[in-house]
Amino acid sequence: MIGDLLDGYRVLAFDLETTGISTRRDRIVQIALVGADENGEQIHYDEIVNPGIPIPFEASNVHGIFDADVRGKEKFKDILSTVHELIDGAVIIGHNVLKFDLPFIEQEYFRCGELPPKPAFVIDTLLLARRLKVGRPHNLGSLCSRHGIDLTNAHTAGADAAASMLLFAQLTKQQPKAFRRPIADVEQWIIHGGVKSDASELGRGL
């Protein structure tokens, strides 16, 4: 099912850890992109990034990355070409990725005077869970626990990215008919519910 939907694309699960939640004031401290390229070759990009500002204790207490951990690490401007190459034209999968991770990374590019990469399609597992009317809570940890996905290292970018990929695979099993169409239609349906064939293909349960 997923293979047919994503065949021919570079598919990457994406997650960030940051100094806070403000795209204007805060900065990235960890970025992970994990998945495979168009030929099925594995991709695992997981980097600690020097944010150039102090990391608040409250943030460090969540993701476990402290000021000492980022000393001597590359800043975002040093990795932006690599990140752009990975994200641009890829199918990006992530939890709350449309409202947090992608806007956050866009601001980092603008801050560096560069245009951000443009994914081919984005699958947000938070929106997907809501579209499928999965019971609350909808945070990544709770959804993974409910679907039998191990998230031992929650709030590390690599673990969260991998978990969102596995969660997507599990969620597709709940309404398989929803994913028997082009990925552009799937993306549209997840975000807007705007695919005309919803009622006939998925039934009234959605």
Task: Identify the function of each model-found stretch.
Residues 1-6, 167-206:
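Acidic two-metal-ion nuclease catalytic site recognized across multiple nuclease folds
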Residues 103, 126, 162:
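Active-site phosphate/pyrophosphate-handling residues
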Residues 108-111, 131, 167-174:
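Active-site catalytic microenvironments for nucleophilic, acid-base chemistry
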Residues 121-123, 183:
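Beta-strand segments within the central parallel beta-sheet cores of soluble alpha/beta enzyme folds
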Residues 156-170:
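Acidic, divalent-metal-coordinating active-site segment for phosphoryl/phosphodiester hydrolysis
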